[in-house]
């Protein structure tokens, strides 16, 4: 959000976050709205399965200008096909849960979306697992990528963990 605020004011989409499900799109949009509340940064969740009114609201936001779009691939392709999106000034592209999107068969849609984005963008790909499909996708869209691997978390050695069943009214006094 901070980097988007440094961008000149425009009607163009500055950041695109592609996610596999409407639930994740809504969750991320809610977080962005909270983080950017006092900044004037605008965002919209674009996903299928809603009413025609939802599509119309999405179209209005996409054509009149929005800073951050959080979208599912299928619905975004629908808007692209109708000429409602312009990614020529896109600065940031995020693929969240890339492994899940590939499992759901979205690879052709992802490649189609990536193909029309500004090539001078920063691209981030997040995945819980790194199967061959994700590695192949990463090679086609990332330039000089940095990989961050997080190990499974375990309790620190020498620390004993315990759980106690306590009635609600006794929780505070027992803490």
Positions of the model-derived regions?
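Short internal alpha-helix immediately C-terminal to a glycine-rich phosphate-binding loop
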Residues: 1-8
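Well-ordered alpha-helical segments embedded in enzymatic catalytic cores
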Residues: 75, 109-112, 170-174
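Small/polar loops that bind or transfer phosphate-bearing groups
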Residues: 16, 20, 47, 102, ...
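Conserved interdomain hinge at the start of the Helicase C-terminal
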Residues: 158-175
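Post-DEXD/H (motif II) to motif III coupling segment of the RecA-like Helicase ATP-binding lobe
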Residues: 28-34, 86-156
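Conserved nucleic-acid-binding Ia/Ib motif block in the N-terminal RecA-like helicase ATPase lobe
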Residues: 8-81, 89-92, 135-139, 147-150
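Conserved phosphate-coordination/catalytic loops
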Residues: 53-56, 104-108, 166-170
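Conserved beta-strand scaffold positions in the cores of enzyme catalytic domains, especially
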Residues: 43-45, 123, 145-147, 161-165
